[in-house]
C-alpha cells in the first residue's frame, strides 16, 4: 500500500507527538548532579523538574494540556475567573504556544508529584495517570486541598496524597519542601459558575494555593506558582535563604491583572533576597506573550542604583539550569552541538568547499 493511502491523522499524531519524544526524559535520567549543586529543567508554563545531588526527582506543576483549539464557541465559559475579573463575554484566545518537551508516560524515576494550585495549566490528569501506572507505588502527590481533591477525584488513592498549607514541611529524601503563602488573587475568584463573587468575602487562600521552597543540600529553589506580587515576598526572604526564585511573568491584556510585570519580577527578586530570578509562564499562552528581555533591560537600568543582589536569567523551555554553576549566566541557549568537529576527516570535494 502506498504511504499516502496508509497514513492517517492518528498515525501522524503518534509519529510526531510529543514533539521531543523521550529526549528530555533520557537527559534527566542520565544527569548526575554534582555535590553542592541542584539541576532543574523547565517543562513549560510553570512546570519544573528538580533533581538533587542525591538523585531525588520531583516535578511541580507539570501540565500536558492545550488551550483553545477551535473557534466553535465564540463566548467565554460562564463564570470563568477572567470573566469575573474583567466583565468580558468573548472567548479568550489563549492558544498553547509551547511544545511538549517531556513525555509523562516515559517517566520512570520520580519521588514526588507537586502542584501549587488547581488551575488547569498547573495540575494534570495525564501526569497522575502516568505516574500511577509506571512508577513506584509509594510516590506521593503533594499539594493544597483543592489539588488533592482533584487527584482523589481522578483515582489517586487518598493515602498517596499529602495536603499541605503554609507552614507545613514535607521531606522527600534529601529535599525539604516548605509550603509557603501564595498570593494568587485569581485563584480566589475561581468559583463554580453559579456562585457569585461580588460582595462576598473570599474564602482562604491556603486551601487553594501554596508557594514552595525546595531546600536541597546544594541550594534552594523558590517556586511561586501563579502568585502576583506581594509585600509578603519580603517576609519569605527574611525567613529563608533563597538562591533561585521563579516568578509568573506575562504581558497582561487590557483590563486584566493576572501575571507579574517586569518591574514586579525585579521587586520579587529583591524582596526574596534571591541570587537569581527567573521568569516563567510567559511562554505558554499566546495572548499573554511577553518579552523576558524586558526584565533584563530594566535590571540593567536599576541594578547599580538600587544595589541589586540578584541577576535575572532568561530561560528556554526544555532547558537545564544548574545552581550555582549557571548563577552568573544571563540567558540560556540550547546546546549547539558539533563540539566534535574535525575529529574525523571531512568528506568534501576539496578543502575550500565551505
Swiss-Prot record:
Superkingdom per UniProt: Bacteria
EC number: 3.1.1.-
Cofactor requirement: a divalent metal cation
Keyword Cytoplasm applies: yes
Record-annotated disulphide pairs: none
Catalysed reactions listed for this entry: L-ascorbate 6-phosphate + H2O = 3-dehydro-L-gulonate 6-phosphate
GO-annotated molecular function: L-ascorbate 6-phosphate lactonase activity; manganese ion binding
Keywords attached to this entry: Cytoplasm, Hydrolase
A Gene Ontology biological process term: L-ascorbic acid catabolic process
CDD domains: UlaG-like_MBL-fold
GO cellular component entries: cytoplasm
Induction and repression of expression: Induced by L-ascorbate. Repressed by UlaR.
Record localization: Cytoplasm
Role this protein plays: Probably catalyzes the hydrolysis of L-ascorbate-6-P into 3-keto-L-gulonate-6-P. Is essential for L-ascorbate utilization under anaerobic conditions.
PANTHER family: L-ASCORBATE-6-PHOSPHATE LACTONASE ULAG-RELATED, UPF0173 METAL-DEPENDENT HYDROLASE MJ1163-RELATED
Annotated protein name in UniProt: Probable L-ascorbate-6-phosphate lactonase UlaG
Organism, as annotated: Shigella boydii serotype 18 (strain CDC 3083-94 / BS512)
Amino acid at each position: 500500500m502506498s504511504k499516502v493511502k496508509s497514513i492517517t491523522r492518528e498515525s501522524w499524531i503518534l509519529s510526531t507527538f510529543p514533539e521531543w519524544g523521550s529526549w528530555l526524559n533520557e537527559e534527566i535520567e542520565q544527569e548526575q548532579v554534582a555535590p553542592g549543586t541542584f539541576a532543574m529543567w523547565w517543562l513549560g508554563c510553570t512546570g519544573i523538574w528538580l533533581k538533587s545531588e542525591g538523585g531525588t526527582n520531583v516535578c511541580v506543576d507539570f501540565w500536558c494540556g492545550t488551550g483553545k483549539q477551535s473557534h466553535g464557541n465564540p463566548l467565554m465559559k460562564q463564570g470563568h475567573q477572567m470573566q469575573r475579573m474583567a466583565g468580558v463575554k468573548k472567548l479568550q484566545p489563549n492558544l498553547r504556544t509551547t511544545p511538549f518537551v517531556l513525555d509523562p508516560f516515559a517517566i520512570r524515576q520520580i519521588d514526588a508529584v507537586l502542584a501549587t494550585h488547581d488551575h488547569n495549566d498547573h495540575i494534570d490528569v495525564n501526569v497522575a495517570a502516568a505516574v500511577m501506572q509506571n512508577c513506584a507505588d509509594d510516590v506521593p502527590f503533594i499539594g493544597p486541598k483543592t489539588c488533592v481533591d482533584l487527584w482523589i477525584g481522578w483515582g489517586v488513592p487518598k493515602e498517596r496524597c499529602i495536603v499541605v498549607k503554609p507552614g507545613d514541611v514535607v521531606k522527600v529524601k534529601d529535599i525539604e519542601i516548605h509550603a509557603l503563602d501564595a498570593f494568587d488573587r485569581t485563584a480566589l475568584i475561581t468559583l463554580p459558575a453559579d456562585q457569585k463573587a461580588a460582595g462576598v468575602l473570599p474564602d482562604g487562600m491556603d486551601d487553594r494555593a501554596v508557594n514552595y521552597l525546595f531546600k536541597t543540600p546544594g541550594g534552594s529553589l523558590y517556586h511561586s506558582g501563579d502568585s502576583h506580587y506581594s509585600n509578603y515576598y519580603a517576609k519569605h526572604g527574611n525567613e529563608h535563604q533563597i538562591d533561585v526564585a521563579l516568578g509568573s511573568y506575562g504581558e497582561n491584556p487590557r483590563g486584566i491583572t493576572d501575571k507579574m510585570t517586569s518591574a514586579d519580577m525585579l521587586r520579587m527578586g529583591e524582596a526574596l533576597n534571591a541570587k537569581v530570578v527567573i521568569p516563567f509562564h510567559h511562554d505558554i499562552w499566546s495572548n499573554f506573550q511577553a518579552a523576558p528581555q524586558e526584565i533584563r533591560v530594566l535590571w540593567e537600568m536599576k541594578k547599580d542604583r538600587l544595589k541589586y543582589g540578584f541577576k535575572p536569567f532568561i530561560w528556554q523551555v526544555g532547558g537545564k539550569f544548574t545552581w550555582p554553576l549557571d548563577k552568573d549566566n544571563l540567558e540560556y541557549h540550547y546546546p549547539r552541538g558539533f563540539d566534535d568537529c574535525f575529529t574525523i576527516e571531512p568528506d568534501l570535494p576539496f578543502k575550500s568547499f565551505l
